Amino acid sequence: MDIAARNPLLYDNVIYSLHFYAGTHGMELRNRAEQAMKEGLPVMVSEFGLSRADGDGGVFLKECDEWLEWMEINKLSWVNWSFCDVDESSAALLPGAAEKGDWNCCSPSGVWLKSCLRRLNAIFISL
């Protein structure tokens, strides 16, 4: 992002994508993104996970809470990786979860995500 901020695309309707994994990326990446936003780049978090970048290694709740707070402060849209039942830490569903839904099949990552969505939805609805 910092590189893009020094030489931004000169087109209308452009947004820059930020990917992070809470177990791998931290303050250094947030600082680079903040600098890019200060320089005028529009940013969206188009992929993030609660795990390491390889999709595994456990769920890093404290780090994800820090990232979520940062995204809220900076009013960034975000998309979580991944809504699947693969046997890895980043998956929101437990292996073998029902295809048609059953929010009781959430992995630790999914439990955190579900809680965030409920909290943020309650804030949005109360506006």
What spans do the regions from the language model cover?
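Short, solvent-exposed turn/loop segments enriched in Gly/Ser/Thr/Pro and often Arg
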Residues: 82-87
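Low-complexity, Gly/Ser/Thr/Pro-rich intrinsically disordered linker/tail segments
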Residues: 103-127
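Extracellular glycoside hydrolase catalytic/binding regions
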Residues: 1-77, 92-112
